[in-house]
Amino acid sequence: MISGFGAALTAFGQTERARRPPKTSSPPGGGLHGGKRPRQRWLWAPVLASLILGAPGARAATGEVALTFDDLPALTLFADQSYVNYLNATLLRGLRRHRLPAIGFVNENKLDEIDRTQQIAVLKAWLDAGMNLGNHTYSHETPDKLGAAGYIADIARGEPVTRRLLKQHGKSLDWFRHPYLETGVPAAVKREIDNWLTAHGYRIAPVTINADDWEFAEPYDDAISRHDEARRRRIKAQYLAYTERTVAWYQTASDTLFGRQIAFIMLLHATRLNADCIDDIAKILRRRNLKGVTLEEAMKDPAYRLRDPYVGHDGIDWMERWSKELHKDLPWDSWQEPPDEIVQEYDRADNDRR
């Protein structure tokens, strides 16, 4: 199942993590989740109120979540094709078993990191399983590094295989996810990228639940490679506990901003950790009264018609972006970072924080 593991430690999948900002127990302003915002007066306009509270006849969105998986074909510590094949097969079986629709966002540069034919077969397996695919750029770089023109070129370069596979399955390439959730600085760069995406038929996939699964995933890979079963089980338990707390926090944040539960969009990654945890993740969603829906269905929630006002270097989720638009604080007092033990293990496994 896992060939050449001991010698296979590489920077495979490094693109997802290298630009993540360092985490702190008290997020400073502009960090991953930003700091606590000064309390400001909330001025209600009738149209804004209808978006938040739901206009007459608006679609009820309580108890819904769309699962999105970044960095396909896989995010791993190891350039091992059997490992990638196994985790995707396990993940897809679990999603189908629990009737959870999902979309995977592809970095096409990964197709040549191991065996191109088998990597493409992984993407095809997602579509064969009834899932969807989207564009995550070719190289998982950012507008900050590439500039608007270079970033747009990287998006276009990330299309060909994904678009062809979708067409073969009677689908079109409609969805784009920004790497690191970095959407462009200054405003003119963000606007140029947004305009190009719109002109080329893309919709941006927001994030309204982010449980930092990437931080747990590589220590988990490392534990498997070292045949440390006790550590593997401990990391899995810590991840699931953290995920359940984090999902609950975002539900509270939704109540804070909107006075109701929106249809959530959850950011995950195509990892062995999520493959091994998919049954438990499904249980967490059921306990939190969340039913799986497609990304298209979740995006019908009126909240996603709100403007995204954020222009900044840090990638932040849409709850924080909307808190700026609505001039309303998020419940940062109850936010928890991943356990220090996990942060330290991540840095030992792959010390690539910027």
Feature locations, PLM:
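Bacterial N-terminal signal peptides that target proteins for export
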Residues: M1, G35-A45
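Boundary at the C-terminal end of the N-terminal hydrophobic targeting segment
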Residues: G13, A58-G63
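Short, low-complexity intrinsically disordered segments enriched in A/P/G/S/L with frequent Arg
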Residues: R20-P21, S26-P38
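Bacterial N-terminal signal peptides
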Residues: A45-G54
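Active-site beta->alpha N-cap acidic-glycine motif
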Residues: A61-L181, M266-L267, I284, K291
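Alpha-helical scaffold elements lining the catalytic groove of polysaccharide deacetylases
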Residues: A79-D80, E141-K167, P186-H200, T208-F258, ...
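C-terminal domain-boundary segment and adjacent tail
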Residues: R97-A102, P206, R260, A270-R354
